[in-house]
Amino acid sequence: DYPCDAYIHSIQNGIDYSGIHHCLITHIHADHLYPSDFEYLRSGFCKLPEDYEGFHLYGSVDVEAKVAKIAERTNGKLVFHCIKPFEPFFIGEMKVTALKALHGTPNPYIYLIEKNGTALLYAHDTDIFPEETWDYLRKCGVTLRAASLDCTGGVHEDLEYTGHMCV
């Protein structure tokens, strides 16, 4: 995800974003997608190497609606890939599958990411998975090495917060 506070995260954690070229977006809330920052990929705002391959965003049609016009203005520096749930695709050597989530936006995703026989389930900002997602996970034959799960409100024993697991 690329949240509204991405810049401060880069400063606080010493992350050089110039080496990051791909980003999976889970959903369109501003704490996960802040498209205004991508305006700075336009000519006149930043100096990029001549061979810059672009910053690739992957997400649902909801994400596309938020970033399409910005991407057009960046002359190929922001590249959007509209992905569908349960249809694996590759980013380099990583196999990525968007899975349906439940989170109060029309098409939220969580991601199953596989590389060299290792798998990660990235499942933030989702309630208990929809049945289609459970079915896919049961049938796909992947053994997870790690899972990163939603923990919003996890310290509150009796919190009911639709769109979050609260674990």
Regions found by a protein language model. Give the residues of each.
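Histidine-centered divalent metal-coordination motifs
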Residues: H22, T26-H32, H103, Y161-H164
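Residue-level marker for buried hydrophobic side chains located in beta-strands
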Residues: L24, L120-Y122, A147
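Metallo-beta-lactamase
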Residues: P49-P108, K115-N116
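Cap/insert and terminal regions of metallo-dependent hydrolase folds
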Residues: I128-V167
